[in-house]
Amino acid sequence: EIKLPVTEILEELKLILKGHHEAILQAPPGAGKTTLVPLALAREPWLKHKKILMLEPRRIATRAAAQRMADLLQEPVGQTVGYRMRLDTRVSSNTKIEVITEGILTRMLQEDPSLDDVGLVIFDEFHERSLDADLALALCMKGRSLFRENDPLKIVIMSATLDSHKLEELTGATVIRSEGKQYPVDIVYGKASEPRDSINDRTVAATLQALADHPKSSILVFLPGQGEIRRVADSLMTELHHRKIDGVHLRPLYGNLSLEAQQGAIAPVPKPGERKVVLATNIAETSLTIDGVDIVIDTGLAREPVFDPTTGMTRLHTRKISQASSTQRMGRAGRLRPGRCYRLWSKSQQGQMAPHATPEILSADLTPLALQLLQWGINDPMELTWLDPPGSGPWLQAVSLLVRLGAIVTGSNGLQLTDHGAQMVGLAVHPRLAHMLICGQSIGHTKTACLIASILSDRDPFGRDTPDMNERIDILLGKSACPNQHRGWFRRTHQLAENFSAQIKQLVIATATNLPEPYQVTGYLIACAYPDRIARRRHAGGFQLANGRGASIPGNHTLKQSRWLSVAEIGGLARSKGDMIRSAAILDETLFESLLADQVTTNTIVEWDGRTNRFIAEERQQFGDLILSRNKLSKVPADAKGKALIKHVQTAGLDPLPFTPEIRQ
């Protein structure tokens, strides 16, 4: 028996779920909702011996929640309480509570839309509004209405900061609020932050001051990304050494770290009297109690993936956090004792922040969502009930890409999933990479395809060092040495590649009639996943992509001299005209005549030449916006002349046309 603030509302929650199918629980950080709610509901009669699934937004929170509950039951993880996440599952036939990452639930719903052996799904930290969580909630509600009329699936949505009014309207659920027992946190605002301000300098100065003012405290610092964490850590290390400050451990905490390294950041310091500074992304906002922390330093920034519909690319944007996120971060200082939160912005700027973060469904690439829904037989996303429905533009763009990848076709009954598309759904990866894996199997190069897919499914530690995908593959194959600092990446990537290989071997895939030469394989496979990013060299280091964008390779890498590239990863600013190529491989242009020939189009182009005052016509072979060849036509198609004149007038006006004075008047 353990007493935490949420204990006070558990009986009320049980009573509501006895007579209703949904409930919303709003409780502050540290109230105990993640640990106690599943345990309290596990023996309710209405559960009928079925399982409880609890979704967590991150892997470290998934494992930590399962471990805490198992500890309370004095059992190992995998007995009554277990967890499921990619590449790591600990459950047994005795498991009644499964803590899972959000993507796992969507795959479970594809295999069994009714979730027949599940009695309750708990959405924890739902305020984060990830695409997977929104999709899973919509599919749970749809599956319940279709398949669980007599034994409805129950749903509990939990968070500390939540727009509960929208959820009430959507689900009709009763809202329960636990006041909790948050220790008081003193908030200290800084001067107004400016875009040109150095995050590194302000954060280092604030951290050093906090170490001096609170000599017994450990500190949690929120930074937008891995790069900032590395730079702040380097600066702090130098300053601590210069000032002869001992007994302070610097611990990074971000998603790309191994689970063991993440666990090291939240664990106690090695010796009494020592302390730590945890440099974290927003991974530390929710579901974690970091031992010893009662001081928070918040930069007020986060890095989020944003899909750019004009280019079809997803970029990481550094943005100001919402008021809800700032509350979550502040709460980290009051989990164990009274604390203090230093906000590196002014009080007036706090009032200008958005109340809640933008849901991912409104800014994400919808291709994975579209493929999932089409597998369910849903042609129109509006057939589901959403908190925020996906936009029609991004939806149509996602459908267009799936058509290009051969996943769907347009039939008499609307959009239909092809056999190829059904195989793509079964692979737990973005549809682009699923298509590439199947293509790799068809040409007899499954291993290379699995390595590329695993490299692109994780954060790339070599982005600053080399743009050549083959150099990464050589490291994984043991042809080149792996730097010591990337050994964790090496293990994770191999493990993921083996997982992809096991999945792809379960599929029956026809062998391709055209097979590439070994030196063509990497470029071809990347082109399968990213046909819109095939690039042709136009000047030293500069390339034009098939989607019309410009891109360049930084530094002096030999790939700069290549005539054709297949680009896997790209970066840049949304409004800039050019992007930076992060990883790519040489593409053999003879593939346009063989394996890529089905994507080459033949177009007749007619234009008015203002210099010679006549029509010119040519036939172009194109791959997207890239012209492969052009042949002049001796005869100009009559039906194209009018359009050519209109286009010329729209850009140049009437003056260049050879009109007589009488006609001009």
Label every PLM stretch briefly.
Residues G247, P252, I297, P305, ...:
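Second RecA-like catalytic domain
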Residues E1-M436, A512, G571:
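P-loop NTPase motor module signature
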